[in-house]
Structure formats: C-alpha cells, structure tokens
Amino acid sequence: MLGAAWIAGRAVLPAIAASRNGRLISIASRDPERARAMASQHSIPNVASDYDEVLADDDVDAVYIPLVNSLHREWTERSLAAGKHVLCEKPLGMNAGEAEAMAEASRRSGRLLMEAFMYRFHPRMQAFVDGLGIDDRPLHVQASFGFPLSDPSNYRLQPQLGGGALLDVGCYTVSVARWLLGEPDTVLARARTDRATGVDMSVSALLHFSGGGTASLWCSFESAEEQSVTAVTPKGTFSLERPFTAWQDPHDPFQLMVESFADSVMSRSDPAITLDESIANMRVLDRIRDEMRI
C-alpha cells in the first residue's frame, strides 16, 4: 500500500484483508503515524519507512496506489519498473497522455496495471447494464455525482494535485455513459470554477454518440449528496440510485475488484478494466476539459 489515504483505510484495506486471494504485506505513508495506525487497525505486518522500501520488498507482488492524482503516473511507473503489479486509483492519470505512458510502462515491464473503478464490479451495477440488453441500447443516458466540499486544504480543491470535480467524480459519469453508449463523437461542456483556485466545482457535459445516443452528465462539489444514472430506452426508462458508491449492500465492490485484479495477476490475463478502456475514458475527460476552457 503506497499511501494511507482515507479510501484505503475505509474500503480497500478491509477488502484486501477479506479477499480470497490477497493479503496485506506492507504500508508506507508520508505520515508515519497514520501508516502505523492503519497497520495496527488492519493487521499489516510491516510499516515501511517510505514507498521505495515497499517496492524493494520481495514479498510484495502488487501495490495499490491511492495517492493524489498528480502522483499516479510517477508511482505507477516506479512500481512497474520495480516488478510490481499495480492497482491505481481512478482517474488513471491527469490526462490521456499520462494514461498512455502508464500503459506503455505496463507493457514494457510485463506487469499488470488496472484502474480502480470499483463501481464496475458491483452486481447491482452489472445487472443494471445487462438488464438493458443489446436490443435496449439507450437513446439517452443521464448520470450525476455530486457532494459538498468546501475545505480549501482538501487535495480535491488544489489544481496542482489534479483536483476538480471532473477528475474526481466526473470520471464516473463519463465511464458509465461510455459503458452504455460507446464512444462519443461530439462533446459540449461548461463549468463553474472557484475564482481563487480555478478548480472546477461543477461541470455539465452533453455528449453525442456515433450510434445516435446522447448523454447528459453532471458532477459537482457544490451540491448535497447526489448520484444516479438513468437510461431512456424504446421500452422504458430505467434508473439506479447510488450507482457509484453502493458499498456493502450486501456486496462489497472493493473486495470484488481486488479479487478480480488478483485473479488477473495470477492467471496472467487481461484485467476486467483494460488499459485501452482507461485511456479512452481519459480522452473523453480531456475533451470535456477542453470544452470547459480551463
């Protein structure tokens, strides 16, 4: 574990500990006290002095990277070069160029790299997508993800760290729209930005797809808790509430994700979320950002 981020302690460490095919070996953090606390809480046998010590540990087969977005590429590439497989938090990189470089590093090293989009593994999300069926391809998709955030010290509000609503939660809305409709041929977008930092606080995007479908996407750090996905089809309208963070109800998508990742590592097979998929998602995020003009 490279880093002791909130999501690691809240979800990923328990998922690995409960998984059928993984175990926790080592953790490092810029905050040693935080690392020691997490190690104690989750029975991690080793607290490393720094990230490089984790990467030098022969007992470590794979690393999970929950670092801020601006550090994803550096530590993914260093981990791959050290012979470790990598499960990296979303978004994979700061832009498509970074994602492409990370994918090349994975191919060059012969080690697996997967983006940690845990919502893709939840049975209720998979059932929603499968239930639409090939003959019920949506005419229109609406996806939203918002929550209130105002603490200026939060990394999500710091542009140099890859902050902003689009990369943090908008990546989910783009992912689900592409999952249902394919790749867009037209992208329009607008954003509300924080005047002091320039970080995008709310983003609206309209996408048109080559198959004729459309999508309206919205993400925000200014709203009350809000997330949903709706698919309008010729046979009806289907909606799913809390599609992106439905933890432990009763399935744990984080555990399903880490088990799938470990299965791919051990079988030397492509991961459930391929690098081509992750790069394509970053390209659409880049197009939205270009339209936002920030």
Q: What spans do the regions from the language model cover?
A:
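Beta-loop-alpha module in the N-terminal Rossmann-like domain of NAD(P)-dependent dehydrogenases
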Residues: H42-A105
